[in-house]
Amino acid sequence: LHKAIRRQRQMCIRDSTYSETGNSFTDYIFLNKKRVGLKPRLEDNMLDPEHTKSHEIGLNAGFLNDKINLAFTMYKTSTSDLPFGGYLPIPSQGDIYFMYNGCRIDNKGFELTLSANMNIGQVKWDGRFTYSINKNEVKQLLEPQKNPITDTDFNLEEIQMAKGSGWYTPLKKGGSIGDIYVTDLQRDEQGNVVIDKTSQNVVPVNEYIYAGNADPKYTMGLANSFSWKGFELDFVIHARFGGVGLSMTQAVMDQFGVSQATAIARDNGGVWVSGEKIPAENYYRLVGWARTGTVYTYDATNIRLAEMSIAYHIPVNRWVKWIQDVRVALVGRNLLMLYNKAPFDPESTASTGTWGQGIDNFRQPSYRNMGFSVNLTF
């Protein structure tokens, strides 16, 4: 029994780290100013540096002589004194732009990885499953500050980060980075869209409601690798669940009547809303261009075949001794979307910035890549 226990023993490694980092404001200077523009700006020399505290706990465990491995990491970061910019009304001067330390944001989550490697007959198999969750929350918004010109107190209930027709993304205390608010249509007590009998159309409401967050609730990944007699097969499936996205592309095309949705509506004699048919032109001229953001808000859940490769090791060493191995492979990335409700790829990015995520505004479509590789080992 003791020998069996020793053979099947497991190894567990735990670690914990804590760090604090600072990020100073931009050092790029032009004309003795850190920013230049057409409107007057105040110098931002009094800004405090951005400050981040992070704590991470990890666990690594191996079972069955490391044929099965488990890795778990949990983390939390707190970033304070984030710099933001905004306009303040100044009597007799108009609006003046200035920078200020805006808020504190906490970020927490975990990642779980389960991997296995074993032989099934003559086939060697390596598999890896990952599951991760990440959440952020605005814990504190702008502390009461003084107007640098008038010396009066001012405070902000929210910081508007981006805005478009029928939508905007704010920072609010208790909210998260990536929150999207949209305009809606008038509804009855049961939540059904109200139809105006006179105009034979829906009724827009110029108030914003919370649509969701651009970030997923959780992500999953599955990677498998099989090898047999010089052949290799590898594939990766990636999935993100939850989150929302808004398509300005679809909204603009609907406005001009050049989308597939408007063509179908014309062929069907109108658009069915709450059991009533509305003329297609009336409906899309009113809600198009995302004037009603809820119409163009989509679930961002998607599952895709992210990567796949087939390879073969040519045994050239049998004939050419100075070449150890030749590996020929066919590789494809972003090959197949297995599930996606949105009319765009939710994983594609509109920019490298933070505040435009989840908004499809004529962003470039994602690409499917295919190629081959030849590797020689001497």
Predicted feature locations:
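Short, exposed "boundary/linker" segments that immediately precede the start
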Residues: L1-H2, R6
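Extracellular/periplasmic, surface-exposed regions of secreted and cell-surface proteins
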Residues: R7-Q10, R14-K163, T297-F378
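A surface-exposed, glycine/aromatic-enriched loop/edge motif typical of exported proteins
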Residues: R7-Q10, R14-T26, K135-V194, M248-E276
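Compositionally biased, intrinsically disordered low-complexity segments enriched
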Residues: C12, I57, F226, R240-G242, ...
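Outer-membrane beta-barrel transmembrane strand signature
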Residues: T26-N69, L156-V236, K277-R318
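Glycine-rich, histidine-containing beta strand-loop boundary motifs that form or position
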Residues: M74, F235-A239
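Short secondary-structure capping/turn micro-motifs that flank functional sites
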Residues: G121, L233, F241-G242
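Extracytoplasmic gating/loop element in the C-terminal half of outer-membrane beta-barrel translocons
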Residues: R240-R327, V331-R333
